[in-house]
Amino acid sequence: MNPAHLLVLLAVCVSLLAAANIPPQSLNLLQFKNMIECAGTRTWMAYVKYGCYCGPGGTGTPLDELDRCCQTHDQCYDNAKKFGNCIPYFKTYVYTCNKPDITCTGAKGSCGRTVCDCDRAAALCFAAAPYNLANFGINKETHCQ
């Protein structure tokens, strides 16, 4: 093999080894998904299209207690955005899960801690609220005005 090719191959291998040591930075939504599954027994997918407020957006009157959990979570994120540079959907944070307990760590009042507290409250609310299968996948245009 040509020495130049070996040098390129060596450089690629070293780069891959270095990249393997970089810890993956998960997005907040992945952390929220894990938190939901820590607090309760349902998968996070059970909430994506639930009611008027679970999932993207939200309008109208919440359909039930679980939908109110999602509305409150949306409002909590809106409050977190007041930090100026705080983007809740992408802000990562530190927490521990000891099923079903969740503990947020980090500086109280910081963007990360605030977002963690929002997600923690929502995950615990989801776990405690009754789940009405009839409210999953509803037509938001007709039910959420």
UniProtKB/Swiss-Prot annotation:
EC main class here is: hydrolase
What protein does this entry describe?
Answer: Basic phospholipase A2 2
Q: Major location, coarse class?
A: secreted
Q: Which residues form the propeptide?
A: 20-27
Write the record's keywords in alphabetical order, separated by commas: Calcium, Disulfide bond, Hydrolase, Lipid degradation, Lipid metabolism, Metal-binding, Neurotoxin, Presynaptic neurotoxin, Secreted, Signal, Toxin
PANTHER family named among the record's database cross-references = PHOSPHOLIPASE A2, PHOSPHOLIPASE A2 FAMILY MEMBER
Residues in the signal sequence: 1-19
Q: Which Gene3D superfamilies match?
A: Phospholipase A2 domain (1.20.90.10)
Q: What organism is the protein native to?
A: Bungarus fasciatus
